[in-house]
Structures are given as C-alpha cells and as structure tokens.
Amino acid sequence: MAAVAGAPGPGEGGESEQDSETIPGERRLGRLSCEPMEAELDSERRSLVRCEPCCGMEIDTQENAGPDIEQLGDSGAEQVYGIHTNSEFVSVSAVDYMGINQGQIAPENRKARSEQLPREPFLQRQPIPMILSEVTDSGIYTGLCLEEAKFSSNNGSEASLNYSECDNRSVGTTEGSVVTSGIDSLIPGSEVQVTLDHIIQDALVVSFCHGNRIFSGVLMDLSKRFGPHGIPVTVHPRREYKNKPVESIQEESKSFHEEPLVKSEENSPEDVTPIQQLENCKVQNLWTTKPPPLFHEGAPYPPPLFIRDTYNQSIPQPPPRKIKRPKKKIYREEPTSIMNAIKLRPRQVLCDKCKNNVVADKKEIRKVATDSYKTEEGKRRRHETVTTVNKKLKTDHKVNGKSQNESQKRTPITKVTNLAHGRGKVVKVPSQTSAAKTQMHTKEVLQNKNMDHVKAREVLKMAKEKAQKKQKVTTSSKNAHSKVHFTRRLQNSSSGTLPPRLRIKPQRYRNEENDSSLKPGLETLRSSKIGIKPQTRYSATRSAGETPSEIQSPSNGPEEISSEMQDTNVCVPPEEQDLQQTLGKRGSKSNITVYMTINQKKANSSSASVCSSDSTDDMKSSHSECSSTENFDFPPGSMHAPSSSSSSSASSKEEKKLSNSLKIKMFSKNVSKCVTPDGRTICVGDIVWAKIYGFPWWPARILAITVSRKDTGLLVRQEARISWFGSPTTSFLALSQLTPFLENFQSRFNKKRKGLYRKAITEAAKAAKQLTPEVRALLTQFET
C-alpha cells in the first residue's frame, strides 16, 4: 500500500498548486486504478463525469495510470470527492459511479474513501446517506473497507495519508451508524445510505447497494391512514393498560427481555450463527413492543384484506352494535274459521223492511185474536148495520129517479188506502156530475173523517169475518211486501171472484215534491159521468216515486193490512167485470194504494202499459227512471148494481183469462260485465268495497253479476254475488252498493281498525294488483 503524497503524475505539480490555490483546504487522498472507463467528479460543476479512454493508450498502461481521488471541498457534513485525469469529462449518473468494477482496483489502493455526493438540484438522482460494509475476497473481486481517512499535511503540495488496517470489525462513520461485515451483520434500526430512483405520488422508489448486491424497494407515506392507491397499511395503536399499573408492566417486559439474553450467554459463541442471532433479535423486538389492544373505543373497523392476512394478530375492533330485535305482536285470533265467520256477521240480523214485516205479523196475529173474540158478540149488530145501509141506498135511488140511478149505475170508485206499519185507512170517494162538485166533495170527504171512517170500518170488519171462515188471513199479509207480485182476491160466496191486482212499488229515494202529477188524473176520474162523456179516456203521466199528496190522509184508527186487501169485494161489485189495478205508491214514510177501474174490453197488455219499479232496502241499485204514459178507459155505468150468481161465475172465468194476459214476465241473466246507470263498468272478478248494515266498508270480490229485465226490456235490478276477504261467507248486493277498491281506498280505509280488517285489506290489495287489464279482459271475454 503506497502513499501517493508527492506523486505528481502528468501535470501534477502545476495542477496541484493551482488546485490548492483556487480551492482552499484541498487534500490529495490517493490514486485509484480502474478499468478503461474512468470516472471523476468535476470540481466546478460538482457533478459526476465519465472519463473517456486516453488516445493512444493501451489497457495495460491505462491500468497503472489510474485517476487521482481528491477531496474537492469540505462544507460541513457534505464532502465532495473527485477523480482527476487528463482525459475529457463525460457526465455519468450516481449508479454508474457506484457501479465501478471493483475487481480492477489496484492492490495498493484497496482502501478508498466512501463518497458522499452533494444534494444539488441538477443531479438526476439525489443520494441518501447509507452504510457500506466490507465484502470479503471472492475470486477477482476485492473486498472494500471504508473508513475515516486521517490527514497530516502542512502545505498544499504535499500530503500524507494514514490508513488503518481493514478487518471484519465494525467501523464508525461520520453519521454515527455501525457497519459490520456481511449482510447478516445488518441490524434492524441501523441507518444505511440509499439512492432515490423515482417519486410516484405518495411513494418513493429507492435502491441500496451492499457490496456486489443491489436492493430496491418502495417507501410509502404513513402520514395518511391507508397507503397509496388504496393499499392499506396496518398501524397498530399502543396498548392502554387500564387495570395494571405501568411499573409492573415494565418490570414484566424487562424480565422477559433478559431471559433470552441469559440463554444466549450460556451457549458458546462459536455455536451461535448469524441466522440464529437475527431470529433472536426479531423475537426480542416482538415481545418488547406492546401489542395493540384487542378492543378499544373509537377504533375504526379494519378492512377485510387485513383480517385475512393477520390471523394471529390483535386487530382493533369497533364497539359491538346493538341488535334491534322487533317485538312480536301478539294477535288474538280465533283458532277456527268458524269464529271468524261469526265475527263478520252483523249485530242486527234483520233489516228495516224485515223488521217491519215481523212486527206487522205479530200485531196482526194479536189483532186477529182480539177480533175473533169479539166476532160472535157483534155479529148480529154488524149484519144489521149493513142491511140498514143497503136499504138507505135503495131508497135514495128511488127518490132521485131513473136519471140519477142510471148516472150512478156505472160510476167508478176511487179507493185510497194509507198504510203505515200495518195500520191504514180506507176512504171511498164517489164521483159527482161535475168537476167543480168533485173538487168540493173531495175536500169535504177529507174533512169528514169520522163519518167515512165508521162506514169503512164496518165494511172491513164484515169482510174480515167472512174471510176468516173460509181462508186464513195471514197468508195474504206475508205477500204484502213482495217485490212484484200478482195476487188474486179472496173469493166470497156472495160476491164471487174479483179481478187480479198488480201492485207497483216506486223507489224510495225520490222526492215527494212532484206528487201533484196524479192530481188531474184523480180529479178526472172522480168527475167522469155517463151523460156528458159516455167514454172518457184517462191519461196520466207517472214517474217512479211520485206520490199524490192530496190523497194522503192520517189514519185515525188502526186497521189491518190484510183486511184492507179484502175490502174491495164490497166496494166494487163483481158484475161490472172491470179490472182493478193497484197503483202502490210507496213514499218514504207510508204506502198509498190507489184502486182504479179499467174497461174490461180494452184493459190488456197492449192498451194499458204498466210501469213497475222495484225498490227494496237491501237492493238500492240505481235504475233508469221509469216514466210512461198510461191510458185508461172508463165506461159509463151506475154504482153498486145488484148482481146474480150467473154473472159472478161468468166474470170469474173472464178475469182468469185477463189475469193471464196481464202478467208481466221478468227475465234474469248472468253476465260477465255490466254498466251501471252512473256509467261505471263492473266486471266479474273485480275487487270492490261493499257495505252491510252494522259493518264498516269491507273489501270483497265479485263472483257473479245478475241482471233482471222485464219482457219489455225495462231494467229491474242489477245484483252481484260477492265473497268477503277474510271470511268464507258470500252475499248478494246491488251494484250501487259497490265501489272500486283502489280508486276509493283513501276514503274507505279505516286506519284505526286492525286484526282481521287489516288482513282482509292486505289480501284485497294483493288481489287488486294481480287483476291487470289483460286478466280483466280475459275474464269478460265470454258471457255466461
């Protein structure tokens, strides 16, 4: 190992003096032999340069003539070293400079100084301080040991360099770090010098040269919670000991840390290998550091990738969440469907109409018992009163003369019956010779109630007495409220069979303001006579629901419905052979039956058009208004002429034929869809709201639709058979009592009701959603 002090080289004397003058403190370190490619650091540009091979110089001569390694400047921690040659300078990088083949270094220049390159912006790559260790000789490669150079120079021209022997022990550097021989000698926590290659956002790509090995890696910024580009980084928080004091924890960690050291001292130093030393160091580091807590408040939930990669480590977990369990709602339900069906039944079983029928039957039975008890006592008295009345009528006819007798022979009788809950009154209104007298007489008859009532009561009692002997009276009272019925009068032995009677019921919802439409007809009927008009044609236009207000009179005495139906055999004689038609006008509070005589010859289905409209409480369907013009012919004749048995038998046969011809047929048909009078189209399978008395609006499904019409095409009723949701029961309701389910949901739904009501609503909603227009069209494609 030869010192290079005083070895000038080519142009060394002048150059060294100039360098010493221009750059104060410059010191010659030594000569370095290298391969033909030589490197040097320019003192002025302060950058690494590559020296091209000298012209005309061979490799052998070039190997001996190596460049000079000099210290170009000393500025505190940053020291710059350069290689001086006479060749031209070419810029080189730090990697090229560090990658010089160390095998061609001359043996006398084994010891060299490690370079600390300056951190200047013009450098391509900024070096970072690192520690180099000596590499043992292997083949042509020579180990390099770096150490601090000691200088002793008094002037700038001569300099002496003292080198210490290179051995395997660690050498202290200027940075205060420790470097040992071999890669196994590297200890975690020591500082090394790396080279910065690339800067990528939050990551740094660095390289580290250790002897003939080059290591590279990525350094990530840990100031953020997770690494760059979504790569998470585990940062374990410090364990917080809440139960144990700090001193006891430190003593435990120290005692555990000392145990492996004692074991290592017991073993011989020759048996311990570097790998075992490294493993011991790792174990010591793991146990000396405090493990992270298993659970602490405020810890973020770890990403799932780290849970998979860290099975045996404690990971911070968030506090356990409270699991909300819904409370079970207990519904008190009946075990069987029978109880559900019973629950759906209304509290009031009978409607208003049925109640009236039942009450009327009960009252009628009671009155029949009381009347039958008094029948025997007043039998003679009643018979005598009837004979006296007949005698008075005969004497009146004789006094008045033949003209009056003929004029009164065929005068029609208008009988008005006022029915209210089984009680009624019969008023006989005979017609007069003039219209003015008829109007005055009508007022007088309505005012003289007592006299007319006594006569009518006697006639009714006598008729009831005869009827009880032959037939039961209760049969006729049950048919009093039938919808459209044809009844034959009860036969008497003396009077024979009366003509059939048609009872017509209007709708209840009509107002009674237009009740005066029948007034002119009734006045004309009363004023008809034989002398002036032999055949008076009576025309009356009637609308459904209109009730004559003049004829309505309060009932002064209770009478039975059945007796009122039977009293016509006394008022109208059978030999007149006239049809009687009952026009039953039912108002909102009372029933009024008007009897009018019709000519037998012209009273048929073609000459007299009959208008019938059915209205019941349970069937409130909206029908088209029934209005028609009816023509009645009233033949001249007298009143109450005596009859014979032959005429009564002949009239009974003729009346049977007429009754068959006057019967109005009614047809019913099941349809798949129907249009209501208000314009709505209802189909089979629709989900609707339905209402029953005593129940809320309930969802139902239409099973069938029945439309009833007369032979003339007049609409009578529109009825639907429905099944209730949540119940196995079915009902028959009018289409007017049904409303669409989805359209009227907000107005019909009751939020306060629960239980079966909610279940029925849920089922109906599901069924309504499934009922698409396509399904509805398929259901209504074919009519049944």
UniProtKB/Swiss-Prot annotation:
Listed GO MF terms: chromatin binding; histone H3K36me3 reader activity
Subcellular location: Nucleus
Source domain of life: Eukaryota
BP GO terms, sorted: chromatin remodeling; eye development; head development; neural crest cell differentiation; neural crest cell migration
Protein's recorded name: PWWP domain-containing protein 2A
GO terms for cellular component: nucleus
CDD domains in the cross-refs: PWWP_PWWP2A
Amino acid composition bias (Low complexity), ranges on this chain: 605-614
